[in-house]
Amino acid sequence: MSSVFANVVRAPEDPILGVTVAYHKDQSPNKLNLGVGAYRTEEGKPLVLNVVKKAEQMLVNDQSRVKEYLPIVGLADFNKLSAKLIFGADSPAIQENRVATVQCLSGTGSLRVGGEFLARHYHEHTVYIPQPTWGNHPKIFTLAGLSVKTYRYYNPETRGLDFEGMLEDLGSAPLGAIVLLHACAHNPTGVDPTIEQWEQIRQLMRSKSLLPFFDSAYQGFASGSLDADAQSVRIFVADGGECLAAQSYAKNMGLYGERVGALSIVCKTADVASKVESQLKLVIRPMYSSPPLHGASIVAAILKDGDLYNEWTLELKAMADRIISMRQELFNALQAKGTPGDWSHIVKQIGMFTFTGLNSEQVTFMTNEYHIYLTSDGRISMAGLSSRTVPHLADAIHAAVTGKA
């Protein structure tokens, strides 16, 4: 008897997660995984922050804690503290109760809930995403019921921002369209607008009533400063206009597998925010009912305790600084080898990723000859590098560029 699912076609591996699958199959002792965006120590090991261990110990020691369901919108403390973290403690939007915040399943879940809410309650169903962007963005919004278009963002010639192209494309978008913006540390390029450029983007978007939807996956991880990395979002909130923001604590607290995130919608009035929250519950309830308790409790414990918060900012800065130093080491190694081309973009780009400018053939060559795994667009996760592995990567890039293995 054949299966009723016999005609199901095998799906391709996820372009990012598939890199790790291939890496695990490789038996080489020199193999290096620079595909997935997860922080590693200098020894190449996953890191659990000390402050997270302390918070977890506090939770374990608290005998009053139970495992009851959270409300649909999640842990109240977590939501309040998350909004403060991204918008600033003195944000008028928060003080005036104009922000609806719900706990979601990390960044992906926050984007999906936001997308589904917009598909049901916003008059314009087109979302513009940067070209390039994180591979999951188009799928998330399409499945949420929105139609996806792109705007120019990256200039491969300069390996920097195509600012003119970006303004031109947003300028010709229909009135009221939704625009996805990376709050900081753009993935995959590592290229961000300056504050002055953000201000121009804000003016253009507000003049066309374009609705900003920020994806903030790396607050504090780009520059090492939580406030600096939230400037783009705060510029838009300061003008009194409306916007959405998806937050993830995967990277900045190392809580990848806990799936902790938040969606905040900044509204014009407290009354509107309250109605928006009521509708967000209707999106969430049939999707996953309510979010997990543990990760949100860790985040809330850290954000509300002054000592833990300060310790977190130090650990976060240490992670950001290590990535910045890896950029410098890789750049220096390529300079020392005399690798053809200008590699200064490696130190200019920020955040977890570097968009190397290597093409898919060069990437395949590096994987086959040097056992280095990265996505086919040439994106490398700087967080996966160490002083020990930089020379190996520099050798591989040099060979790929010069064609001399």
Swiss-Prot record:
Its main location: cytoplasm. The modification N6-(pyridoxal phosphate)lysine is found at residue 251. Its EC number is 2.6.1.1. Signal peptide: none annotated. It catalyses: L-aspartate + 2-oxoglutarate = oxaloacetate + L-glutamate. Keywords: Aminotransferase, Cytoplasm, Pyridoxal phosphate, Transferase. This is Aspartate aminotransferase, cytoplasmic. It comes from Daucus carota. The lineage of its organism: Eukaryota, Viridiplantae, Streptophyta, Embryophyta, Tracheophyta.
